[in-house]
Every structure is written in C-alpha cells, then in structure tokens.
C-alpha cells in the first residue's frame, strides 16, 4: 500500500513538472534594421520572436522605446504590427544621429511581461 501511495505521488508531481510555463528567459528576439547603414529619419525594424523550441511567439503585444546612449534626448516610441507568425514590424522615426538603445517591451499572450534591448550604433545624419 505504501509503495502504491508513493507511486501515485511521483506520477502526480511528474505531471505538474511537464505542465510548467515557458520561462521568459527562453524567449529569443532577433532584429533587423533597415536601411543599412541606418540614417536619421524613418527606420524599419523587424523583430522575430521565438520560443526555446524555435516556434514563433504569436499574439504578443510589442512596443519599442528608443533612447540615445547619452542623456539629453527624449525617448522615441513605436508600436508594432504582427505581419507573420512571430514577426513584428515597426516604423520608428529616429530624430538625431548617434548611437541608440532600443528597448523591446513585450507582453506575451499569457500576460507575462518582459524586456529585451539591442543597440543601433552609428545612425548617420540624413
């Protein structure tokens, strides 16, 4: 009887272990910026968001925030549109030459929020 109870408990715990939520650390965001090299004005930013199993993350809410790498410039914001499963596109107006840090504010379909960042170095004058 004791062995049966132990077996049932082990199966119960194993069942929950298989149902764990995907960790935000397992989300990958790849980015492409055009034109190349980047210039002051409108940039097209395409994000490809995938899970650890390389499946596209669909239905996320994604906003971008661009900040210059030095103080003194107001941030620039842009929304995104999901144009294909896991592919999100934004048009962002970059008003000044220099180095920019892009923050990706991401809300997953289950409501979990996370942030990632990447740099756009050497934005040239228009």
Regions found by a protein language model. Name each.
Residues 1-4:
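Positively charged n-region of N-terminal signal peptides that target proteins for export
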Residues 19-126:
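N-terminal soluble domains immediately following signal/targeting peptides that reside
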Residues 6-15:
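Bacterial N-terminal signal peptides
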């Amino acid at each position: 009887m004791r062995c049966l109870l132990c077996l049932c408990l082990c199966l119960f715990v194993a069942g929950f272990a298989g149902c764990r939520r995907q960790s935000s650390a397992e989300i990958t965001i790849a980015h492409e910026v055009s034109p190349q090299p980047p210039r002051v004005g409108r940039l097209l930013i395409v994000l490809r968001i995938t899970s650890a199993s390389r499946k596209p993350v669909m239905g996320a809410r994604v906003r971008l925030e661009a900040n210059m790498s030095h103080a003194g410039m107001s941030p620039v914001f842009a929304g995104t549109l999901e144009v294909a499963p896991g592919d999100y596109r934004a048009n962002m107006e970059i008003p000044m030459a220099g180095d920019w840090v892009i923050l990706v504010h991401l809300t997953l379909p289950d409501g979990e929020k996370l942030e990632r960042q990447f740099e756009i170095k050497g934005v040239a004058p228009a």
